[in-house]
């Protein structure tokens, strides 16, 4: 029987004149939480349940659908800049590819909570008695009118207003602990359509008009409008329902809990959370909870205790041993009685029902077996009561009553709180750049890299910088390239420092944006001499002098603590800075002019570096002009013949060519500061591949912090691509990194370091195993909200796969799918 009598916003009246207020519980991220964090969530939920001393609670986990096309269309609104047309076409192609792979919609779990509103007793006086009699009489007339005419359902405006006030108080209580949203008529209708087999409609695309006719004393709605979402042919069999619509049919079966045969220990009892990851098909769950007050619960427990004592005495008098079941039950009852007496808590009558649907009977049987096995592993025995399918179906409807008393479980608030209601794995944004999908839930993951600086509610960082860490071949460069590419398509600008020259063919492999790709390949040819001279490359004279000091102290090893050499070097640099022709070669000339043993020694030391052809890029006589332009959307800077030191090489062991290579990286990275300080309205990226090479030297570390801080102020993100999280784990840098991506690692110390970098429990063996077992292209990701999950990076297009793949080519084509 359809229970709903009237709906007003989030209030639902049933045929017994009970009123429920329904809310959507905004899911909270539960993945990779520490045990302490899980207990905090558990306590909040337990308090939420325990605050109701009487009445009923109706909790629903519903597998709804969200439209992939709608999300992609929303993402298109974020696109700006010169490449807008290319980006729109790319997103459209991406949409078609995703729809062909996973369908128009993806499963999205939503959580609903309904609380029965308990009327406070009015003061007994003549006025209230008259009002009560009047309302009863009017209700009788309305019922007669509805029975005879079956058209309109009416509700007294006074009645509505009374419950609206009560609902406001309840909403205030709940919202202190969890994020909630009041339901609307559309939500109830969408829920009922789903329960009656109407699938394939995304919530965003669903409409449900519920016209109301407001009179002076009452409000009318059409009864047909209330029951419209339930329209379908329902055929009941012993173990399932067949739901038929004009264009589709589905089969639905219902399970209820027969017995819980073991302990559900928290944390590890979060059924609602784990079943989202376990099942590839939608599963709905209903918890109909009746609150039993503490006094009544104690009376029930003590009566049960008397029954058990009688059984024990009877066995004793008969000369038999008391069965182990009775002994265990007596222990449990004693413990429960003590607990209830001390805590003054309520008990809860729980009716737990699971709904499984499928397009045909064979698939329904397979899914039912899978659900039963999953609950069996948790020591929960399910049963599918024959002939009760329609009644159990009714338990899912808003404001419904418990259908059957045979399968009631008496539980405490701890048990209900430990089921993980509302827990899910959430990553990224609702719209933006599609980078892949969650390995655990299969949900698409979207990012908006420029969002951090906007101060969006809920974010735990305002840092635009990102880190990509992991061992060789895990996929960090691929992920980094993909994110930079789409950021440029969406209207951003990027400078990529490409020390290994892996991106030199992008103009050929990415023809759609070739005109906006600028590849600067710095060779040791004569025409390039001096292009990386600090005095030449920096626009500002002071910046050039500062960088010259950094480079020359780095190359010569002269420390600020060296009271003899340092002042001489700085004096020479300052004189060159003030001259007309500024260049590092002129610093040597200036030192020789001093003609002291110390100045000649420093001049000879610097001059020794110029003997390398490769070093000509760094040294100029002040006549070279800066020809490096970063005006394109995507700029790639390569330096031929760079020789980076090995990751484990200490600074003291660097060869001369390695010193020069790192010095050039520092110069180019500093040059990126000018790029960062360009148009603040455009999101910019400075991408530092092999970042460890200069993060491991003092000058590079200082520069990194400078880049990150400038980037945050000027709407620019610095992307560090490096092999070890230790390179970016120093507090000064770590706290300024927003998005984090960690790819596979097998070294235990590195794994622990990475988990610490993510703010996770580094000693947790499960966390370590997740990172160790990541496959190629999978990464641990932390978003701007501090949420962590495992993502499969998904380029969608094979041309992007080939363009961004930095692995050596193989002779035969491999099927990457």
PLM-predicted stretches and their roles:
Residues 312-314, 450-484, 497-504, 520-525, ...:
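Conserved P-loop NTPase motor cores
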Residues 53-56, 109, 490-492, 517, ...:
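Short glycine-/polar-rich loops that comprise or flank the Walker A/P-loop
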Residues 1-410, 421:
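Extended, folded cores of ATP/NTP-driven motor/assembly subunits in large transport
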Residues 100-101, 540-582, 729-817:
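P-loop NTPase motor core of the ASCE superfamily
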Residues 35-53, 276-279, 292-299, 380-381, ...:
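P-loop NTPase motor domains
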Residues 125, 439-445, 450-452, 457-470, ...:
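Charge-patterned, long linear interaction tracts outside catalytic cores
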